[in-house]
Amino acid sequence: LLNQDIDYTVHGELSVNLLDQEHFESHKEILKRDIEVSGEIKASHLVTHFGQTINNVHENKELYASHLMKQQECYAKMGEYAKSNNVTLAIENLFPFTHNHYAPLPSEIAKQINEINHPNVKCCLDFSHAYINCTHRNAHFINEIKMMGPLSEHIHMHDSFGTIERIWTYIDAE
């Protein structure tokens, strides 16, 4: 690919979750290695997922805020590391994989990315994930994507009915 006149993106592991405090250091190390690989193969962007957690953690506002702050500090540091590797992080929105999980809405992600305010920390707006999450949380889809859209340097578009756990899927995340 290096002899082609194209830009390309690496999609990092779905499992990286910087809101998972129990395995935070492992998630951070995987993200760091993804940045290194992306830089080595000259990818312009690395898509990685904004963290998600369980409802009980989200409902404890003080605990959730501390998890968000730790993730934000990590993204700021990883933004510098990405910059040194000529890579931009494209942080993708998710949806809750089950009814017991909490995935932040696009507006919540946009708020954190704006607070980080780093040229190498941007967004990947996944329209279907946003639709599923907005439907699940009864949030206004268009208003939500308007918040994240201007920060997005990469997008994902695919079909979705906007629901979770209604039919069998090949893997849970599907």
Give the positions of each predicted feature.
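Glycine-rich, proline-tolerant flexible connector loops at the mouths of alpha/beta enzymes
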Residues: 1-2
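Active-site proximal beta-strand in glycosyltransferases
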Residues: 8-9, 125
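Long, hydrophobic/aromatic-enriched structural stretches that serve as scaffold segments
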Residues: 9-15, 43-45
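Short glycine/serine/threonine-enriched helix-capping/active-site loop
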Residues: 11, 48, 157
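Conserved radical SAM core fold
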Residues: 14-18, 53-57, 131, 161-164
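Active-site acidic/histidine proton-transfer and metal-coordination neighborhood
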Residues: 20-123
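Acidic/histidine-rich catalytic cores of soluble enzymes
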Residues: 82-173
